[in-house]
Curated annotation (Swiss-Prot):
<keyword id="KW-0539">Nucleus</keyword>
<dbReference type="InterPro" id="IPR001130">
    <property type="entry name" value="TatD-like"/>
</dbReference>
<feature type="binding site">
    <location>
        <position position="215"/>
    </location>
    <ligand>
        <name>Zn(2+) 1</name>
    </ligand>
</feature>
<dbReference type="GO" id="GO:0005634">
    <property type="term" value="C:nucleus"/>
</dbReference>
<feature type="binding site">
    <location>
        <position position="104"/>
    </location>
    <ligand>
        <name>Zn(2+) 1</name>
    </ligand>
</feature>
<dbReference type="GO" id="GO:0004518">
    <property type="term" value="F:nuclease activity"/>
</dbReference>
<comment type="similarity">
    <text>Belongs to the metallo-dependent hydrolases superfamily. TatD-type hydrolase family.</text>
</comment>
<dbReference type="InterPro" id="IPR032466">
    <property type="entry name" value="Metal_Hydrolase"/>
</dbReference>
<feature type="binding site">
    <location>
        <position position="144"/>
    </location>
    <ligand>
        <name>Zn(2+) 2</name>
    </ligand>
</feature>
<keyword id="KW-0540">Nuclease</keyword>
<feature type="binding site">
    <location>
        <position position="9"/>
    </location>
    <ligand>
        <name>Zn(2+) 1</name>
    </ligand>
</feature>
<dbReference type="GO" id="GO:0005739">
    <property type="term" value="C:mitochondrion"/>
</dbReference>
<dbReference type="GO" id="GO:0046872">
    <property type="term" value="F:metal ion binding"/>
</dbReference>
<protein>
    <recommendedName>
        <fullName>Putative deoxyribonuclease TATDN3</fullName>
        <ecNumber>3.1.21.-</ecNumber>
    </recommendedName>
</protein>
<dbReference type="Pfam" id="PF01026">
    <property type="entry name" value="TatD_DNase"/>
</dbReference>
<keyword id="KW-0862">Zinc</keyword>
<keyword id="KW-0479">Metal-binding</keyword>
Length: 294
């Protein structure tokens, strides 16, 4: 078995995991997951994510950011405001040295969330400020772009963002290729098994631009069923099927891509990398060895 998989985008602070997170993470370890990139959506989650990163040190890796849709109550999701960002920034500054990336950030032009030009423009301003923050901290961006693929990629390029992961991209492959040309990565969730759009996307994306994610508890292989990080192998297997290559190649290359995207991840696991270079055709490590370092 290879060095291990990296779940590049998941929501471990979600209430769905309140009662059994230990079990969920143990299942992930047994599924050869070596690292979980935990993203935030609003300031109210930040402390919880940092606590999880301490409790599962070297396994749960924290990202803090302000999402374009603020679901502070399930009944009233709304478009983000600059005030939301102002609340979040001091907490991000507090933890800046411990962050793997800034995220989840981005644009969401779904009409029910951003029905006016003013709301879309405020989303852009919130994203621009977080791009500037990520550049100052020299960390990547973990990006949401629902119903806003082209505007998101255009803004990121205009702002000079270089380290970017576009998670669960829902746009056309031709638009995604603009991101590929900018050096951006695209993470693919297990829901690819039921998404013709994701399958077309993967068919066109070069493997060198693909990472794996689960977006747990969302975007699982079955609709309306809680997704978990252990399902990441489902995404890897389906990508292999779509591209007509071995699942071993998908696992190896997507993990290597994750290390390129997240430099701090490479630093964290430097000893493992020295023992089992990701560039090698066949990694010699085992799941047990990976766990021992985490």
């Amino acid at each position: 078995m290879g060095l291990g998989l990296v779940d590049c985008h998941c929501h471990l602070s979600a209430s769905d995991f309140d009662n059994d997170l230990d079990d969920v993470l143990e299942k992930a370890r047994k599924a050869n997951v070596m690292a979980l990139v935990a993203v935030a959506e609003h300031a109210g989650e930040f402390e919880r994510i940092m606590q999880l990163s301490e409790r599962y040190n070297g396994f749960v890796l924290p990202c803090l950011g302000v999402h374009p849709v603020q679901e502070l109550s399930p009944e009233k999701p709304r478009s983000v405001t600059l005030k939301d960002l102002d609340v979040a920034l001091p907490i991000i500054e507090k933890y800046k040295d411990r962050l793997l990336a800034i995220g989840e950030v981005g644009l969401d032009f779904t009409p029910r969330y951003a029905g006016t030009d003013e709301e879309k423009e405020e989303q852009r301003q919130v994203l621009i400020r977080q791009v500037q923050l990520a550049k100052r901290l020299n960390v990547p961006l973990n990006v949401h772009s629902r119903s806003a693929g082209r505007p998101t990629i255009s803004l990121l390029r205009e702002q000079g963002a270089e380290q970017v992961l576009l998670h669960a991209f829902d746009g056309r492959p031709s638009v995604a290729m603009e991101g590929v040309r900018a050096g951006y990565y695209f993470s693919i969730p297990p829901s690819i098994v039921r998404s013709g759009q994701k399958q077309k996307l993967v068919k066109q994306l070069p493997l060198s631009s693909i990472c794996l994610e689960t977006d747990s508890p969302a975007l699982g292989p079955e609709k309306l069923t809680r997704n978990e990080p252990c399902n990441i192998s489902i995404a890897a297997e389906f990508i292999a099927q779509v591209k007509g290559i071995s699942v071993e190649e998908v696992r190896e290359v997507t993990t290597r891509n994750a290390f390129r995207l997240f430099p701090k991840l490479q630093s964290l696991l430097q000893k493992e990398l020295q023992s089992h270079p990701l560039q090698a055709k066949s990694a010699q490590g085992s799941a047990g060895e990976s766990k021992g370092l985490l």
